[in-house]
């Protein structure tokens, strides 16, 4: 009796990723790394390879390609997923892989005046999003994915769902954003109403929620605060729906605002988060509070901002100034 036909390897990977409800970004990244791994070994099938070939590829990324530690870790995760979840081949722990060293770099931080200059040069919805990122310490993807129900005006707080590491947290809602956010939400819900009348209006929901609350996708509270300006086709389901504002559009707007402000620091949307943390510590807030607002698992991650505060030898008089 012949073995049942199996779909191509990459299609099997895609199906397994979707079965586990990983994000589209993770799906795209894993498939890309698996393709690179196969091409690196001259199109040999991964089932005919093992830990040695995985180690060779990951070591090559560090020794020859000089990739960052986070890049190597993503490649390793993709290959471990391939072997364990798709091919059902257990690999021994890859202790002998040359690891990319994560450099000890201080985060780029803007002064309060520089933040003000940048925010003044952002326009439209990007201006509000920029103020929200700086005012709450959100990551950019947390900002664009914010849902209406998670802006709690009465409590002056924002609930940040499923952040990095799949953890929810709460951050402060600045008083200066109360009115602009109310206006933005009114506009977002008006757009949602138009989508409903056009026969659409089903926002994307995580799989478990979509199964548990099948009607939630059309409810106002689940809509994005920053909806995309147009509807698009969901690449997985084929459903026409309105996604959230794209992060790349804001990144471009931020780069332009930094240039227009005459700031030479390599500031990005993440810089607003770094500046939020540093300015809170500079204002005297304790590091544990800042840790919770940022959603760091370990306080040592938050400690990097204390090094920024100490930069420049505060309290030390340069010998040059004594000449």
What are these regions (language model features)?
Residues 1-323:
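Conserved catalytic core of the tyrosine transesterase superfamily
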């Amino acid at each position: 009796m012949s073995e049942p036909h199996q779909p191509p390897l990459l299609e099997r990977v895609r199906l397994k990723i979707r079965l586990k409800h990983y994000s589209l970004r993770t799906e795209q990244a894993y498939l890309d790394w698996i393709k690179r791994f196969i091409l690196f070994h001259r199109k040999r099938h991964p089932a005919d390879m093992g830990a040695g070939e995985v180690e060779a590829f990951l070591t090559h990324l560090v020794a020859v390609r000089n990739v960052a530690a986070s890049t190597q870790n993503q490649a390793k995760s993709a290959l471990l997923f391939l072997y364990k979840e798709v091919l059902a081949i257990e690999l021994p722990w890859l202790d002998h892989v040359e690891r990319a060293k994560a450099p000890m770099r201080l985060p780029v931080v803007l002064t309060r005046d520089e933040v003000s200059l940048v925010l003044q040069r952002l326009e439209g919805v990007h201006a509000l999003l920029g103020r929200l990122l700086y005012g709450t310490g959100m990551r950019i993807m947390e900002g664009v994915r914010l849902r209406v129900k998670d802006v709690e005006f009465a409590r002056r707080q924002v609930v940040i769902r499923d952040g990095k590491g799949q953890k929810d947290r709460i951050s402060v809602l600045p008083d200066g954003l109360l009115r602009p956010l109310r206006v933005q939400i009114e506009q977002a819900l008006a757009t949602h109403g138009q989508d409903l009348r056009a026969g659409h209006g089903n926002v994307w929901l995580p799989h478990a929620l979509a199964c548990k609350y099948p009607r939630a996708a059309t409810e106002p509270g689940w809509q994005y605060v920053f909806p995309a300006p147009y509807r698009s086709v969901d690449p997985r389901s084929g459903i026409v729906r309105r996604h959230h504002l794209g992060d790349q559009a804001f990144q471009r707007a931020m780069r332009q605002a930094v240039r227009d402000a005459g700031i030479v620091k390599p500031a990005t949307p993440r810089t607003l988060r770094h500046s939020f943390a540093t300015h809170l510590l500079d204002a005297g807030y304790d590091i544990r509070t800042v840790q919770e607002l940022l959603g760091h698992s370990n306080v040592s991650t938050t400690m990097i901002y204390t090094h920024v505060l100490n930069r420049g030898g505060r309290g030390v008089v340069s010998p040059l100034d004594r000449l």
